[in-house]
């Protein structure tokens, strides 16, 4: 403990900010294992993830979508919220909507239901020298049934990114459910990405405002790609994995030199995670 305090004091004395970390969970998706007949395995996985977060005590936990499997399912939502409430009150929890939370084609009704159960579907938050932008990627990618809501979110994002340019606000980091793309920014449309025409518009906006990191989920496996200076990281699931992946979560370290990250399977989580 004494050594840690000396290192921290030295870093502050030299004008450097100490490193810190947060945890990214994704796709706990209560109901997926048993196709909405139950969620015993999801309960076990999420209980373990929350207990581990309490042990590691990160700056915050963000859950990048698909909290539940069936949009509007009261039992799945209640179980997610019951376990999430076990997180240490000193650790902020940020929910992000996924397509299984608001529907593949969100409507005003599904958006209202999500907001009632889980809170706002897009918003910003601050953590040390980071400015988090939570986006509703389902609404971005499929706006047809809620066009006014989609337009409102897009206008809001532009305004908030402009505010974030002010000195002292912190580096912008985006959290959403769908990755913008899997391999290349101009790839063809598919289930796992954002439609190309919409994607191009938003990528231009993120580049315009100097965003360097987007953390997503949706794929139930780990994927990483980039568009110039913009890194797109899709994180594997707390819930059911696909494609040979394993359940786990990502540790993201934020320091003076930038951002680094590592995905840990549940069986490989170290006893402690000092800032790197």
Where are these regions (language model features)?
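Sec-dependent N-terminal signal peptides
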Residues: 3-12
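N-terminal active-site segment of His-dependent metallophosphoesterases
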Residues: 14-77
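Structural motif
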Residues: 22-24, 62, 132-134, 173-175, ...
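Active-site glycine-centered loops adjacent to acidic/histidine catalytic or metal-binding residues
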Residues: 27, 65-66, 98-99, 177, ...
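Short active-site segment of divalent metal-dependent hydrolases/proteases
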Residues: 30, 68-69, 101, 180, ...
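Extended active-site neighborhood of metal-dependent phosphoesterases/phosphodiesterases
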Residues: 36, 73-171, 189-192, 196-208, ...
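Short acidic, glycine-rich surface-loop motifs adjacent to enzyme active sites
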Residues: 164-184
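Histidine-centered catalytic micro-motifs
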Residues: 173-180, 212-222
